[in-house]
């Protein structure tokens, strides 16, 4: 991970940018889904009811053979440059093809260094078209579990704000712009 400081008009806000995936061997390692050991409340890349999840999955592959991790890193680098230009400092969780930080470690790193954590991903459901942007909202089953209970409203507000910005820029938005998924990263986040 690397922190970049804005050259001018610094806002004293650090944005954690996590280019999803990009860990050699991450799919063969498991981490607890929730800090309290409780089972997942929804499905996703890990089934509902599971107590352990893949540390970092390999992600999807685009129709042209490009790995999701390659595209998320390119997106993260563009986002980093735009944030720095606006005066935000940026914690880049991953700056290359491989970083040996699982989803829990990435979240804990952002918890300790950043003011917010944005994890970039693509949804690989085999569609031959762009179904649109969305953020992962916090499912009701997690809203009473700490540290989620103390932060879920901020998580959802940030996600909604990001999607609204994308909508304003003319991007395609998936359904209402959010999808309830029990993510390991959400359950460990304190920012």
Where are the predicted features?
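Catalytic-site microenvironment of enzymes
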Residues: 1-191
């Amino acid at each position: 991970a690397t922190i970049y400081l804005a050259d001018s008009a610094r806002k004293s806000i650090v944005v954690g940018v996590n280019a999803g995936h990009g860990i050699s061997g991450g799919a063969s390692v498991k981490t607890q889904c929730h800090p309290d050991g409780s089972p997942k409340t929804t499905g996703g890349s890990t089934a509902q009811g599971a107590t352990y999840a893949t540390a970092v999955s390999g992600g999807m592959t685009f129709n042209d053979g490009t790995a999701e991790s390659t595209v998320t890193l390119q997106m993260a680098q563009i986002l980093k440059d735009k944030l720095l230009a606006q005066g935000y400092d940026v914690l880049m969780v991953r700056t290359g093809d491989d970083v040996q930080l699982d989803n829990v470690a990435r979240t804990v790193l952002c918890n300790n260094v950043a003011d917010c954590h944005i994890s970039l991903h693509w949804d690989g459901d085999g569609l031959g078209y762009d179904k649109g942007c969305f953020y992962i909202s916090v499912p009701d089953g997690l809203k009473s579990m700490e540290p989620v209970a103390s932060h879920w409203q901020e998580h959802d507000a940030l996600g909604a704000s990001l999607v609204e910005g994308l909508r304003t820029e003319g991007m395609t938005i998936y359904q209402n712009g959010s999808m309830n998924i029990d993510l390991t990263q959400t359950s460990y986040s304190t920012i």
